[in-house]
C-alpha cells in the first residue's frame, strides 16, 4: 500500500529571471519607436511582472518556465512578435558596410574548397595531436627534420607528448597503422594543421619568441588497393601516380598554374623515391613520394605508403603572386616540335624545362616529357629524353623560319648548359 501522498523534494525552487529592458535599446533593435505603454502592456500580457520603471526603461521578472527569455534581446523579440513584424516599416534607406577578404580568409576558403574536393575523391579527413614523440626526431636521423629544431615541452604529460610536431607525417602514420591493424587496409587520408620549428639562431634574450615559428601544412596519405578485385577485373594497387594526380588537382583548384611549377627530385630521406614541386624561385610547394623502408619497418607496415606534404603557407603566397588574366582563344594555330635528347643520367627534366622557358619566354607555351629511355644502344652514363615543345603566337601564324630559329636557339642552349645531344 502507498503509505503517504506524493512529496515534492524541491529544496531550491526555480526563481523568475530578472531582466532590465531599456527603451532606446528596444527601439534600436526593432528599428522603430514603440510607445512605452505599448511595451509595458505587451510585457504584462506575457506574464512578465514590472518590478520597477523609469523614463529610460523597465525592470522585469520573467516567469521561470520561460527558459528561452533571459536577456533583453529575448524580451524585445517577444514584444515584437506580439506587436507584429508587419507593423515595422522598412526604411527607404539602408546602411551597410563592405568587408574586404584578407589573406587569412582566402587561405581558409581555399582550404575548405580543397577539403571538399579531396572528400569527393574518396579521402577521409583525420585529426592528430600536435604533440608528438621526441623519439621520432632522435631515432630516424631525418635530414629535413633534425632534432635540434624540435620545439620541446618543458613539462610533458608523457613521453609520447614530449615535443611539438615538425611534420604531420608521424601522426598520419599512427592513424594508418591503427586502421591497418583493424583490417582496414585500403586508405586515403588527408589532414590540415600546423607544424612547429625552433631556430636557435633567431633566439635572443630580448625577444626569445622569435626563435619559434609555425607553418600551415596539408598532408595526404594513400595506401592499399585503388580498386578491389572482382569477377570482372583484378585488384588494382594504389601508386605514386595516383597521389601525383591528386596533388596536381589541388594545385589547379587553388589557382596555381602548372607552368609556374618546377618538378625536381626530392632529397628528403623520408622517401625511398620522391619529388618536390617548387616555384621557379625555388620555394617548395609540395613534397611527395614513397615512404622509405626504414619508416615502414619502424611502424610495422608491409604495404607501400604514398605521402604528400603540401606546404600550405608557401602555396598561398605563390598563388597570391599569380596574375589571372582572361583572353580570347587564339585564332592562330599552335605548332608542336619534338626533340630526342641524349643527356647525362644525373640531368633532370626540370632543368630542360627551365632552360627552355628562359630561352623563349613569349612563344613557348608548354614543355612536356613523353618518354625516357635508358639501356642498350646508349653510351654509358647516358639516358634519352623525348620532349615535346608547343609554340604559339597570339597575334599571327608562325612560319617555318621563326620556328626553326627558336628550335635552333633551344638546342644550342641545351647543348651548352647540359651537354645535351640530339639523337
Feature map (PLM): residue ranges:
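A carboxyl-terminal module marker
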Residues: 45-48, 68, 72, 202-206, ...
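Flexible, glycine/charged-enriched surface loops at secondary-structure junctions
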Residues: 1-9, 51-54, 90-91, 125-129, ...
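C-terminal effector modules of nucleic-acid-centric enzymes and ribosome-associated factors
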Residues: 1-5, 20-23, 28, 36, ...
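Short, structured patches in soluble enzyme cores that scaffold and shape functional sites
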Residues: 23, 62-64, 155-157, 194, ...
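A glycine-rich phosphate-binding loop feature that marks nucleotide/adenosyl-phosphate handling sites
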Residues: 2-20, 56-63, 93-98, 128-141, ...
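Extended, well-folded interaction surfaces typified by the phenylalanyl-tRNA synthetase beta subunit core
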Residues: 19-23, 27-187, 337, 390-394, ...
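Flexible hinge/switch segments at interdomain interfaces of large molecular machines
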Residues: 5-20, 52-55, 85-94, 211, ...
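Conserved alpha/beta core surface patches that mediate binding of polyanionic ligands
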Residues: 1-8, 32-45, 74-78, 133-136, ...
Amino acid at each position: 500500500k502507498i503509505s503517504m501522498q506524493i512529496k515534492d523534494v524541491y529544496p531550491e525552487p526555480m526563481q523568475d529571471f530578472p531582466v532590465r529592458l531599456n527603451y532606446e535599446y528596444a527601439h534600436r533593435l526593432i528599428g522603430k519607436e514603440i510607445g512605452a505603454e505599448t511595451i509595458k502592456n505587451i510585457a504584462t500580457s506575457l506574464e512578465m511582472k514590472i518590478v520597477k520603471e523609469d523614463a529610460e526603461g523597465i525592470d522585469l521578472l520573467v516567469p521561470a518556465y520561460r527558459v528561452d527569455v533571459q536577456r533583453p534581446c529575448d524580451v524585445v523579440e517577444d514584444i515584437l512578435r506580439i506587436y507584429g513584424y508587419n507593423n515595422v516599416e522598412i526604411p527607404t534607406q539602408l546602411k551597410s558596410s563592405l568587408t574586404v577578404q584578407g589573406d587569412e580568409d582566402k587561405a581558409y576558403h581555399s582550404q575548405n574548397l580543397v577539403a571538399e574536393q579531396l572528400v569527393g575523391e574518396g579521402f577521409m579527413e583525420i585529426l592528430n595531436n600536435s604533440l608528438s614523440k621526441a623519439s621520432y626526431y632522435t631515432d630516424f636521423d631525418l635530414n629535413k627534420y633534425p632534432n635540434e629544431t624540435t620545439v620541446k615541452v618543458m613539462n610533458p604529460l608523457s613521453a609520447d607528448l614530449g615535443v611539438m610536431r615538425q611534420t604531420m607525417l608521424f601522426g598520419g602514420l599512427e592513424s594508418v597503422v591503427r586502421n591497418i591493424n583493424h583490417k582496414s587496409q585500403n586508405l586515403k587520408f588527408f589532414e590540415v594543421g600546423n607544424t612547429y620549428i625552433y631556430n636557435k639562431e633567431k633566439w635572443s634574450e630580448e625577444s626569445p619568441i622569435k626563435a619559434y615559428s609555425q607553418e600551415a601544412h596539408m598532408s595526404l596519405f594513400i595506401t592499399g588497393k585503388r580498386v578491389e578485385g572482382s569477377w570482372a577485373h583484378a585488384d588494382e594497387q594504389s601508386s605514386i601516380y595516383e597521389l601525383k594526380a591528386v596533388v596536381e588537382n589541388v594545385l589547379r583548384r587553388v589557382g596555381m598554374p602548372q607552368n609556374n611549377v618546377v618538378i625536381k627530385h626530392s632529397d628528403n630521406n623520408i622517401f625511398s623515391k620522391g619529388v618536390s614541386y617548387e616555384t621557379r624561385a625555388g620555394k617548395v610547394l609540395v613534397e611527395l613520394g614513397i615512404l622509405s623502408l626504414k619508416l615502414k619497418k619502424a611502424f610495422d607496415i608491409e604495404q607501400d605508403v604514398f605521402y604528400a606534404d603540401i606546404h600550405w603557407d608557401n602555396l598561398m603566397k605563390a598563388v597570391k603572386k599569380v596574375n589571372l588574366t582572361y583572353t580570347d582563344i587564339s585564332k592562330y594555330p599552335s605548332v608542336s616540335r619534338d626533340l630526342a635528347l641524349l643527356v647525362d643520367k644525373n640531368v633532370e627534366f626540370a632543368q630542360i624545362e627551365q632552360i627552355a622557358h628562359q630561352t623563349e619566354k613569349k612563344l613557348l607555351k608548354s614543355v612536356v616529357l613523353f618518354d625516357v629511355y635508358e639501356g642498350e644502344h646508349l653510351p654509358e652514363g647516358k639516358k634519352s629524353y623525348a620532349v615535346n615543345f608547343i609554340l604559339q603566337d597570339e597575334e599571327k601564324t608562325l612560319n617555318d623560319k621563326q620556328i626553326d630559329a627558336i628550335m635552333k636557339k633551344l638546342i644550342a642552349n641545351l647543348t651548352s648548359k647540359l651537354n645535351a645531344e640530339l639523337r
